[in-house]
């Protein structure tokens, strides 16, 4: 069972796997642990990762990157419209209103959704993991930014489903970093001590995230998170690009923004310059050859200029930090350490801002690039039954407050309740109880739309169906379970209606017996029941009060939304009355049944089953096309490689092993094949290359075999000669009555001599025949036949010459009855017996011996 953590970033991805030795970040086919989040579409296939990034400038219109933030968003989203201006590829609306990416693939125009594009990237990551682990990969944990909303998270899960990955958990970036930090710490305070507070700061390519976490031994709790989704490394790159665009326009009269390829080259060079300035404070040059109109451009920048240029971006760093401290009610003195991750935190000015805010040096003990992926792999190992991991509980936080709104049965007013507050623990479930006589609707939304980096505050509409009044006309009690699951997604998981029905006669006796058992319960059970109800109340069993559709804590309890906890004392009093009062006339028995109710969910963003299945089928076809194209290219490369190899060797080691006529003929064929490859054979089917290779091998293979035989044959003949000399010498020693072999029967030794003579004759004949052959002719005997002869000789001779001499048994020595060793043993034995039987003599001492103590007791 595979355990894989995937850090899918806007610019690059990392894969971490769990092995017996621990967590390891694995490399791709280019021996690079960083896989770019880039996909390029061609006329025959698609390329993903490092190969796609190399085509980003030459195939700009069909190379897709920076698409992570498009998940779960509509095409008319203001963020999408703003980002569209800076992209080299086209964004168009889909039929469902989502974002579509238009590219040319297989010489046809295709429209892919963001889920499909992400699925393509996940396909590459899955393939890399499988090649490394040598087994199929299914289960994984995928990272997402902590500010991703329900719609965005559902979209990522759909992408994982398209590629056949079972995402065990969508893990927030900062939570993954915290897990990677805490699980290895041996000096964390115990559970009954004050937790250690650590702040994690992550500035990646496109976003800035911070979180405060409390650590105890084996426990991690996220206290709060804050973020700026629009502040990252690409913003610093954009500042440099703007600066040099203006400079080149003034200096060279070139408008870099007018040509997308020139702009992309400038972005790449500015990113390199930014990284160099992190380690150098001197002036650094920027040079681009043939930038535009065959003109070379150059410029320079130093760290001080860069910091001045990005002053407004650096000021934004403090805002999320202030928000975090305000939300968590922490003081700077409470923070034990500040850990930074993410590539952009390597900028000295960014480090300085963070350190200045907290008044302490930042810590860089975690790998800035791989920390998220490693944390995801650890979480996957914790969830997987295949690995035994140190117990470590992870409690995440809800980033945005979530509320429910519903309509009353008899009134037009609406009821509203905040079921999950900001930074509420997650995953978490709550049970709400409603009084209803018919189906009703619940709508979930984000309570603070201004704080959500998403234009739509609505999460979804949930209709609880099949609700009906009780037979006596009373409203039914409907229990609704709401949950923020492990993925950070809000859902109404279950709904049940409490239905009262008359009990049948055969059930009455069992009901009475149950009531008797309940009345005879020990006093501990009511407390336990009370504790359960308290837990439910802590989990938000109900909003406490309702006033004109709004909930306050000072008003009386809502008649519509009731708490089971509030009803417990009344039920106890009723039971007490029944016990204390004299028996009354029998009333009809009532049976309480919980009926599960269907829930219809209308979510803001969710791919339909038909559309999802279509995407799965499309991805499967593209994977197959990529595989076929790879096999075709491999076959073509094999022909090309064969041509180059033989053309070189025909003028070298193979020259003597082919006659002059065939030599010239084969050289012409190789040249014709090479020309065919670059002309007519440039784009042929796989079978055409296979046939071409077979045609070449018909001539080339015998030449290669003759060369190999000529290299191996003398060595094997030498080995055969050594074996023959060895057995011939043994036979001669036997004839000379050597003591080593005088135990061997003469008839058997004659067999050895016969085998040696026959093999010697065969070898001489073969070597004589081979000497008459030229090197360009097929050999008389091949190396494999000679090896078989050596094996035959060994099988015939070795069992005879290695016969062991028969053992001569020496006469057995008679055992003397009164030997010294025997007397000694008998004395020892008698001594032992005497020690056990006799009582101690010196001052009543007793040796620690069981038998002696028993004897003393008897005395």
Swiss-Prot record:
CDD domains: ASKHA_NBD_HSP70_HSPH1
Subcellular localization: Cytoplasm
Keyword Phosphoprotein: yes
Pfam family, one: HSP70
Modified residues (N-acetylserine): 2
Bias (Polar residues): 533-555, 850-859
Modified residues (Phosphothreonine): 562, 816
Keyword tags: Acetylation, ATP-binding, Cytoplasm, Nucleotide-binding, Phosphoprotein, Stress response
Residues modified as Phosphoserine: 509-510, 558, 810
PTM comment text: Phosphorylation on Ser-509 may be important for regulation of the HSPA8/HSC70 chaperone activity.
Residues with PTM N6-acetyllysine: 471
Family: Belongs to the heat shock protein 70 family.
The protein, known as: Heat shock protein 105 kDa
Lineage: Eukaryota, Metazoa, Chordata, Craniata, Vertebrata
The gene coding this protein: HSPH1
């Amino acid at each position: 069972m595979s355990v894989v953590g995937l850090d899918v970033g806007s610019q690059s991805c990392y894969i971490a796997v769990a092995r017996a030795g621990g967590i390891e970040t694995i490399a791709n086919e280019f021996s690079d642990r960083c896989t770019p989040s880039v996909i390029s579409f061609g006329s025959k296939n698609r390329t993903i990762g490092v190969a796609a990034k190399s085509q980003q400038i030459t195939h700009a219109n069909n190379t897709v990157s920076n698409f992570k933030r498009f998940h779960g968003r509509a095409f008319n989203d203001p963020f999408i419209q703003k980002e569209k201006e800076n992209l080299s590829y086209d964004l168009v609306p889909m039929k469902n209103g989502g974002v579509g990416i238009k590219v040319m693939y297989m010489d046809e125009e295709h429209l892919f959704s963001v889920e499909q594009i992400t699925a393509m990237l996940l396909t590459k990551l899955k393939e890399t993991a499988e090649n490394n682990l040598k087994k199929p990969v299914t289960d994984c944990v995928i990272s997402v930014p902590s500010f991703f909303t329900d719609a965005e998270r559902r979209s990522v899960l759909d992408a994982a489903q398209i590629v056949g990955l079972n995402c065990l958990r969508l893990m927030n970036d900062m939570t993954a970093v915290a897990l990677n930090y805490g699980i290895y710490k041996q000096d964390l305070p115990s559970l009954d001590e004050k937790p250690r507070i650590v702040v994690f700061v992550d500035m990646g390519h496109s976003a800035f995230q911070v979180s405060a976490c409390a650590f105890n031994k084996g426990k991690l709790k996220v206290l709060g998170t804050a973020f700026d989704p629009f502040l990252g490394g690409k913003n610093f790159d954009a500042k440099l690009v703007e600066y040099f665009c203006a400079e080149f326009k003034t200096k060279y009269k070139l408008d870099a923004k007018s040509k997308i390829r020139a702009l992309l080259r400038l972005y790449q060079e500015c990113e390199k310059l930014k990284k160099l300035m992190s380690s150098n404070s001197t002036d650094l040059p920027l040079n681009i050859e043939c930038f535009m109109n065959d003109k070379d451009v150059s410029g320079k920048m130093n760290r001080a200029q860069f910091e001045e240029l990005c002053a407004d971006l650096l000021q934004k760093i403090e805002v999320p930090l202030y928000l975090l401290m305000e939300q968590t009610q922490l003081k700077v003195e409470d923070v034990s350490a500040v850990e930074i991750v993410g590539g952009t935190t390597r900028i000295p000015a960014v480090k300085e801002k963070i350190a200045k805010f907290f008044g302490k040096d930042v810590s860089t003990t975690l790998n800035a690039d791989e920390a998220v992926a490693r944390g995801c792999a650890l979480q996957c190992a914790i969830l997987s039954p295949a690995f035994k991991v140190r117990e470590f509980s992870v409690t995440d936080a809800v980033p945005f407050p979530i509320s429910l709104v519903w309509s009353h049965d008899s009134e037009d007013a609406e009821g509203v309740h905040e079921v999950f507050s900001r930074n509420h623990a997650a995953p978490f479930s709550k049970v709400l109880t409603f009084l209803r006589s018919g189906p009703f609707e619940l709508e979930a939304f984000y309570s603070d739309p201004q704080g959500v980096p998403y234009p739509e505050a609505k999460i979804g509409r949930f209709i609880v169906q099949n609700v009906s009044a009780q037979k006596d006309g009373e409203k039914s009690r409907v229990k609704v379970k709401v949950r923020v699951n492990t993925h950070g997604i809000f859902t109404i998981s279950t709904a049940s209606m409490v239905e009262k029905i008359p009990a049948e006669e055969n059930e009455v006796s069992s009901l009475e017996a149950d009531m008797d058992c309940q009345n005879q319960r020990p006093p501990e059970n009511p407390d336990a029941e009370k504790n359960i109800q308290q837990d439910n109340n802590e989990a938000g069993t109900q909003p406490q009060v309702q006033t004109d559709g709004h909930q306050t804590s000072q008003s009386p309890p809502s008649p519509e939304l009731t708490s089971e906890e509030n009803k417990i004392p009344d039920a106890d009093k009723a039971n007490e009355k029944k016990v204390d009062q004299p028996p009354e006339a029998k009333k009809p028995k009532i049976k309480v049944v919980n009926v599960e109710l269907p829930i219809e969910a209308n979510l803001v963003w969710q791919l339909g089953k038909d559309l999802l299945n279509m995407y799965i089928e499309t991805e499967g076809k593209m994977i197959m096309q990529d595989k076929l194209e790879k096999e075709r290219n491999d076959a073509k490369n094999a022909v090309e490689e064969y041509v180059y190899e033989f053309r070189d060797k025909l003028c070298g080691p193979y020259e003597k092993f082919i006659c002059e006529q065939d030599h010239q003929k084969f050289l012409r064929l190789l040249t014709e094949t090479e020309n065919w490859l670059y002309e007519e054979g440039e784009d042929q089917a796989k079978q055409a290359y296979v046939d071409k290779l077979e045609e070449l091998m018909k001539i080339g293979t015998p030449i290669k075999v003759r060369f190999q035989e000529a290299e191996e044959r003398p060595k094997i003949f030498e080995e055969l000669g050594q074996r023959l000399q060895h057995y011939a010498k043994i036979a001669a020693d036997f004839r000379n009555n050597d003591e080593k072999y005088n135990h061997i029967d003469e008839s058997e030794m004659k067999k050895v001599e016969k085998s040696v003579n026959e093999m010697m004759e065969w070898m001489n004949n073969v070597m004589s025949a081979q000497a008459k052959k030229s090197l360009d002719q097929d050999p008389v005997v091949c190396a494999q036949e000679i090896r078989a002869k050596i094996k035959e000789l060994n099988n015939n001779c070795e069992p005879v010459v290695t016969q062991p001499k028969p053992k001569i048994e020496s006469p057995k020595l008679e055992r003397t009855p009164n030997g010294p060793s025997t007397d000694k043993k008998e004395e020892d034995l008698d001594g032992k017996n005497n020690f056990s039987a006799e009582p101690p003599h010196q001052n009543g001492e007793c040796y620690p011996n069981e038998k002696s103590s028993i004897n003393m007791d008897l005395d």
